[in-house]
């Protein structure tokens, strides 16, 4: 324990040295110009002692798109050429140069400058000491952690408390009979069209992904009236008059329903227009903005967004099908009907780009499915010939389509949650060992199925996006569900509470992912997030959160055991929590300093007292308290259970409170 406390003192000393001796500021360089002065954060000018000049600045984009992948600055000194980009710092004479911004004309670059001769080295020494001490505690013999392990695994298997949850019934809704007959779009034609690629949200993706986003945005689920998302999307593209009459647009706000003249929450696109062919919400929105009526703006925002999503489809924003390689090697994508300008195409190719979608629409409307399939194949082949270096492979296209079909969390999440609750009840009321064993086996199989399911989802999302799926709230909660299941499989045999609570906690994590973020679009990573250190940082932190969540559920079971007078069980559960506390705190500490190293590499500072950093530190300190042997009152079973339950509020604040309510550098998460 001495080394742990010493490491924190060294880390604090490093922070003090950084605060007292470090200098920070910015330099603004224009192409070909040199400077030896940086502007500090206080507005003062500081002589660097050497001159730097901007040689080049460029923005690298993801292949085939205009989405920024990296910003690269090359500067020259008297004797060196430095290349600086996101996650790549330039070093010269003790100064660190970080990419901070650029001029709109791409002829200038703004660099952050940081000079910290002592603080970083001392802080890193503290991190190393902390890591060594944590390893010693986790692997050492005769430690309190070992004693708690023996106590937690002694005796009979532990049961799980029953948890009462009221589940709301999903609303049933019906379709109004439509006066106009729908064109029957062949499912094979729709599926083939769904595998054609488009440029969408600065990413090259199959139309199936656009269709899922489009339909989910309109009606809240990726299907409608027994039709797949791609079939519905094809209807909106090729059978516009009918689909404009379908009441599939969900309007939740009562004020918006009133202005649109609705009797319930379902609207058609035609409901947005009055008898004079004017948009019904245009005047109320303008009036609300003029008066600063934020309440009215909020009421109408969702309905207005859904209206404009359909308008975006009509404007071609969702159907940029045809790639054209420009002279600079970059690609421009054209939608059907869009002006092609002076692009260099022969007459036959130009006709194909302009007319192929018209021919496809004609074939679908007349029911000529073989011709429609042939045209879809030609568009698909055209893309793979004209943009073969940027179009996803056939395997990745099929993988993304499969992911879109598989990634419907509502039904499996509710099923997993219901089963895990029922198994908890069964484990609690089982009166004999045989029934408990049956419940235990079913719990194990449920855990395995959930683990394989979440593993497949994460793997497919990783393959499709090209980066580890831990860049937003939805992905991190999915990863936490997976991490919980992995811990359950790894530790469940020794710790029955972990085995019984694992599927339940994982189900709640999936439920939170479903409720808070729904299913966000897969997007390209912003440049600063393209670091392996970030992936490791998030991964380690989420494993620690999974352990803290398990400990909170175990604490609730321990309090329940105390109320029933089962002191032996209460004591054993306290030992289980105490044992899990060691790896949980260790993972959190390691995750925090990996994040600090990433921040130091990315923008030159390892700590900025951002709200996420501050709350992560508070969480670590609060969970570290029970590890101190001097705090005898925290070693009493009931006290430790109450403490663990309350401490989990810090985890909730660190994750949800900071991500969704507080502003800071971690807002992108």
Which positions does each model-derived feature cover?
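Solvent-exposed, non-transmembrane regions of integral membrane proteins
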Residues: 1-669
């Amino acid at each position: 324990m001495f080394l742990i406390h010493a490491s924190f003192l060294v880390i604090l000393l490093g922070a003090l040295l950084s605060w007292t001796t470090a200098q920070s500021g910015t330099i603004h360089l224009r192409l070909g110009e040199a400077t030896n002065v940086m502007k500090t954060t206080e507005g003062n000018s500081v002589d660097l002692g050497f001159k730097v000049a901007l040689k080049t600045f460029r923005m690298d984009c993801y292949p085939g798109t205009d989405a920024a992948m990296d910003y690269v600055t090359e500067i020259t000194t008297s004797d060196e050429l430095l290349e600086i980009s996101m996650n790549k710092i330039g070093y010269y004479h003790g100064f660190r140069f970080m990419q901070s911004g650029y001029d709109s004309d791409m002829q200038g670059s703004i660099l952050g400058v940081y000079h910290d001769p002592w603080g970083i080295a001392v802080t890193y020494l503290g991190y190393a000491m902390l890591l060594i001490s944590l390893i010693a505690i986790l692997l050492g013999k005769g430690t309190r952690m070992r004693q708690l392990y023996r106590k937690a695994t002694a005796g009979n298997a532990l049961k799980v408390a029953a948890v009462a949850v009221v589940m709301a019934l999903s609303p049933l809704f019906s379709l109004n009979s439509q006066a106009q007959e729908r064109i029957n779009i062949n499912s094979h034609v729709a599926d083939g069209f769904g595998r054609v690629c488009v440029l969408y949200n600065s990413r090259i993706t199959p139309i199936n992904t656009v269709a899922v986003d489009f339909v989910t945005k309109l009606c809240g689920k990726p299907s409608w009236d027994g039709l797949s998302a791609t079939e519905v999307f094809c209807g909106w593209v090729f059978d516009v008059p009918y689909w404009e009459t379908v009441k599939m647009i969900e309007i939740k706000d009562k004020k918006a329903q009133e202005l649109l003249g609705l009797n319930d929450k379902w609207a058609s696109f035609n409901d947005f227009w009055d008898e004079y062919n004017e948009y019904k919400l245009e005047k109320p929105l303008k009036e609300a903005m003029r008066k600063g009526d934020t309440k009215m703006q909020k009421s109408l925002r969702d309905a207005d967004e859904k209206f404009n999503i359909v308008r975006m489809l009509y404007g071609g924003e969702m159907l940029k099908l045809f790639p054209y390689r420009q002279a600079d090697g970059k690609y421009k994508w054209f939608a059907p009907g869009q002006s092609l300008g002076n692009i260099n195409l022969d007459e036959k190719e130009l006709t194909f780009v302009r007319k192929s979608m018209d021919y496809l629409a004609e074939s679908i409307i007349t029911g000529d499915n073989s011709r429609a399939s042939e045209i879809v194949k030609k568009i698909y082949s055209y893309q793979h010939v004209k943009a073969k270096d940027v179009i996803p492979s056939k395997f990745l296209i099929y993988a993304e389509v499969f992911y879109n079909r598989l990634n419907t969390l509502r039904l499996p999440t509710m099923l997993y949650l219901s089963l895990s609750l029922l198994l908890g009840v069964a484990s609690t009321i089982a009166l004999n060992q045989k029934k408990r064993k049956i419940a235990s086996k079913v719990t194990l199989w449920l855990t395995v199925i959930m683990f394989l399911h979440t593993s497949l989802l994460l793997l497919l999302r990783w393959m499709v996006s090209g980066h580890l799926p831990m860049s937003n709230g939805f992905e991190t909660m999915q990863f936490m569900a997976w991490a919980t299941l992995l811990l359950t499989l790894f530790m469940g045999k020794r710790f029955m509470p972990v085995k019984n609570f694992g599927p339940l906690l994982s189900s709640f994590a999936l439920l939170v992912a479903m409720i808070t973020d729904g299913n966000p679009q897969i997007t390209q990573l912003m440049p600063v997030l393209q670091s392996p250190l970030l992936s490791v940082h998030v991964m380690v932190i989420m494993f620690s959160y999974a352990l803290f969540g398990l400990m909170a559920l175990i604490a609730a079971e321990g309090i329940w055991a105390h109320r029933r007078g089962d002191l032996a069980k209460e004591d054993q559960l306290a030992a289980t929590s105490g044992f899990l506390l060691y790896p949980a705190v260790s993972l959190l500490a390691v995750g925090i300093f990996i994040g600090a190293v990433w921040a130091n590499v990315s923008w030159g500072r390892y700590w900025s007292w951002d709200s996420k950093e501050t709350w992560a530190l508070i969480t670590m300190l609060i969970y570290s308290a029970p590890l101190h042997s001097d705090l005898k009152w925290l070693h009493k079973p009931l006290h430790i259970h109450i403490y663990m339950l309350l401490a989990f509020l810090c985890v909730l604040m660190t994750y949800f409170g900071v991500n969704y309510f507080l502003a800071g550098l971690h807002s992108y998460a």
